[in-house]
């Protein structure tokens, strides 16, 4: 099963991706994870990506496409995958369709998690992370036990640069202009299933899994 997961930043795609890949035993291909690995290892690509993300901008198509196809051509993707964070633009979607066609493959479904702007800003700007152990928190729904201190390792938690409200609004604007049109692009191929991302997490999962099991 070859799937794409769409939705604005803060829609809960990561949570749903984990549940879907467990249910259908396919790998989760997250461009965000690939980029973060490069950033952590301070590769040349990682430094470019870090600068762009800090400004709420997208990584250029040619870099992203190269990384994605290198991953999709690996053995564990032979029977399917869940793409999260790619494609983000119409040219990327066209490049993906072209690459799949060359390999005699096609997409099965595009899952779209829809969340309103106010909810997204509240979710994202409330995030806090531990710079030491990577634990994540939220000031409203998952706060630290001691204010501002990581429960696991007692390091002061921080707000990531791309979770600050101004950057969040920029990220949403970029999503609306560049990625949201993908819903129309894939609707023309009759592939899109949209779910309300403000519903309880388990309810969202149930709707996605039920839809995918329809075949």
From Swiss-Prot:
It comes from the Bacteria. Residues 30-59 are annotated as: NMP. AMP binds at residues 31, 36, 57-59, 85-88, 92, 160, 171. Its main location: cytoplasm. Catalyzes the reversible transfer of the terminal phosphate group between ATP and AMP. Plays an important role in cellular energy homeostasis and in adenine nucleotide metabolism. Belongs to the adenylate kinase family. It catalyses: AMP + ATP = 2 ADP. GO terms for molecular function: adenylate kinase activity; ATP binding; zinc ion binding. It is an enzyme of class 2 (transferase). Pathway: Purine metabolism; AMP biosynthesis via salvage pathway; AMP from ADP: step 1/1. Residues 126-163 are annotated as: LID. Its EC number is 2.7.4.3. This is Adenylate kinase. Keywords: ATP-binding, Cytoplasm, Kinase, Metal-binding, Nucleotide biosynthesis, Nucleotide-binding, Transferase, Zinc. Zn(2+) binds at residues 130, 133, 150, 153. It is found in: Cytoplasm. Consists of three domains, a large central CORE domain and two small peripheral domains, NMPbind and LID, which undergo movements during catalysis. The LID domain closes over the site of phosphoryl transfer upon ATP binding. Assembling and dissambling the active center during each catalytic cycle provides an effective means to prevent ATP hydrolysis. Some bacteria have evolved a zinc-coordinating structure that stabilizes the LID domain. It comes from Finegoldia magna (strain ATCC 29328 / DSM 20472 / WAL 2508) (Peptostreptococcus magnus). Monomer.
